[in-house]
Amino acid sequence: MSIDPASRLRKFRYSDTKKVSKPKPVKHIKSKKTRTVANYEGLNDLNPSVQPDLQVLFVGFNPGVESSRTQHHYAHHTNLFWKLFNQSRLLFWVLERNGKTNNKDDLLLNQLTINGESHATAVNDFELIKYNIGFTDLVLRCTKSAQELTMQEKLDNVPRLLREWNLAQAKKIVIIGKGIWEIIIKKQGIKVQRFDWGVQNNAYTQWVCSEAGIESDIHVLPNTSGLVTSMNFAQKLALWNEIKN
């Protein structure tokens, strides 16, 4: 009895073939990236410029390499701090509050104010203490980026920072960077739930002022680093102008 071709084909396909197991997928194990620690040997901390009864105290995250090298705040040429400082005319506002509108005999002011415009730069930071404008940082240690600071190091510096605020008793405390404000609040074990740029009027502010023993207006402004582009210059300048209110 002959087997028809169709039956022979079915017999071959279902009876004579062996099951072939599918190869298991190979898992690719990602190699762990090792975090390199930058060497900043030879770069010194940048000292604060703080004294009692300041009109304005600026607070940065920590000094960058250029600021450490030159020993001046916001010294990198891409940083917008001094451009915002000058265009906001904050120096003139401070002079009015100090009652120093006549600068004829003040050689430094004659250099800083030319034809009714402010021309301050990083090299003037420590000189501005003469007009009750001060500078400090959350962390005084130099790094290329604030991301290189550990959370513990940032938290450990909050008490020192608040002591400086207490000494300064500044009318306006201007924090350059939202992250600084969040660290100060985190020190109390609280996470910021709601945030708006500019002057801070909330329970967080009340706690910070109580801890520092101050009655200052606290303004939180965007970081002025050239690496931060989330807000354009005009928007940043508008927030700086609010300091004078």
Role assignments for model-derived ranges:
Residues 62-66, 79, 140-143, 178-182, ...:
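Short, solvent-exposed loop/turn segments at secondary-structure junctions
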Residues 58-65, 87:
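Short, conserved active-site loops that position catalytic residues or coordinate cofactors/metal ions
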Residues 1-48, 52-55, 75-77, 84-87, ...:
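C-terminal capping/extension of enzyme domains
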